Amino acid sequence: MARVTVEDCLDKVETRFDLVVLASMRANKILKNGYSESMENEKKEKATVVALREIAESEITPEQILRNEIEG
């Protein structure tokens, strides 16, 4: 996927507002823990783009993001 769009992600979440909250939670987690070895273009893509791409490609589910946020 060359570019991530909101439409790519809306199949995975209920509303755009949920998408914003979930993507920001995931991006903050990426920034806090650092980029993993499996993430491509870690120096070229910002954490928000990586988070949106993960959501769009179902690499991580909204439930997993919320669970990770609760667990800390």
From Swiss-Prot:
It catalyses: RNA(n) + a ribonucleoside 5'-triphosphate = RNA(n+1) + diphosphate. One of its GO terms (molecular function) is DNA-directed RNA polymerase activity. Its EC number is 2.7.7.6. It comes from the Bacteria. Keywords: DNA-directed RNA polymerase, Nucleotidyltransferase, Transcription, Transferase. One of its GO terms (cellular component) is DNA-directed RNA polymerase complex. GO terms for biological process: DNA-templated transcription. Promotes RNA polymerase assembly. Latches the N- and C-terminal regions of the beta' subunit thereby facilitating its interaction with the beta and alpha subunits. Belongs to the RNA polymerase subunit omega family. The RNAP catalytic core consists of 2 alpha, 1 beta, 1 beta' and 1 omega subunit. When a sigma factor is associated with the core the holoenzyme is formed, which can initiate transcription. HAMAP family: RNApol_bact_RpoZ. This is DNA-directed RNA polymerase subunit omega. It comes from Francisella tularensis subsp. tularensis (strain SCHU S4 / Schu 4). The lineage of its organism: Bacteria, Pseudomonadati, Pseudomonadota, Gammaproteobacteria, Thiotrichales. The gene is rpoZ.
